[in-house]
């Protein structure tokens, strides 16, 4: 439940505590402020400074990061500090940064401070919640485990997602993480009518604009709130934008009792921004130059993403993997919090299989007979066994050729190639590029189709019939067009 300390006292933005200080030092986004003795603002308090730059008046928001002693506080600016000089008056608001919450945030774009970007001034009269909040108490957590059906074959069969869980999309640059997130927003809105909150953390501004346009064209913008802190923003903004979006999602969960989907693109940029802030604050770096507080900062975010009794926040997070190195501390720290991982592979991508999920590297904690059922588990394990054996045979095939394999292995390779192609699927997010409508396959049909495929029922069907299609009906049509019958 929400405590009064975590809400603002009234609608609108928090007001002043009538305590003012003055700027004594500006170093990029780091601003040192001196306050009167006995009036030092608390950590995470928001401070406001009125400045004029190039004839434009604006209000800078600073967040208290450190107490330096001698009545000095060190703050991080959430906007560019151009025009800020020594001696400028700084007002302590008496509260932390807060964002608007409520049904009205859907269909709009906000920044990390809660300012509406598509309609300036919108949302100022809404109730505001602090972005720094405690996770739900242990006794409030939902004990049941339930699968979230997506309609994507490769996900539902091999890496089933947990309702109210944390799911990560791992991959290097350009393998389709953002496209898969857009696909999930489409599917959740169309198939379940659920509320989605999207956090754009340190990614390209162009992608944010494209997402806004595509959601509007797909008629799902009305069910989605977007919060952006793009890569041209100061590190303080990129570090806080995920918390701002999560706070909006928590309102839908706690006050409306809804199941909410929270999309974060990209969680690596959250870590990267924290590293920049840590360096600016003069902290000693840890492994590979990351901040010493990496695990703590990640935990503060991830522990708030959870299910309470009867309602949930399901999180899907894109994770950029630097240089495709999974031992890097940023993706490695994220692993500890996840219920399912979907790894997008450059090798699969190069085959033209989309979504480019590596079925052998992806995993889920609920791929277990006690959760998904014996039949689902059996079929998934058989698919994995065939694909793993095919991978083991790759070197032999490359050196000696497929003709040197035993008849049993030849048959297995042929089935594995069909399975690989059948794991591809036409997606809603790619309709405008492919001209093919996206398909949704019920999990029961997915299990039946792959069970028959593993048993050899489709050995006579050409490989290309399995490529970028939906379920069994699509397979029958494609096979017939190629002169085969199921």
Swiss-Prot record:
Pfam families: ATP-synt_ab, ATP-synt_ab_N, ATP-synt_VA_C
Catalytic activity: ATP + H2O + 4 H(+)(in) = ADP + phosphate + 5 H(+)(out)
Keyword annotations of the record: Acetylation, ATP synthesis, ATP-binding, Cell membrane, CF(1), Hydrogen ion transport, Ion transport, Membrane, Nucleotide-binding, Translocase, Transport
Binding of ATP, residues: 171-178
Modified residues (N-acetylthreonine): 2
E.C. code: 7.1.2.2
Comp. bias regions, Basic and acidic residues: 1-12
Family classification: Belongs to the ATPase alpha/beta chains family.
Name of the featured protein: ATP synthase subunit beta
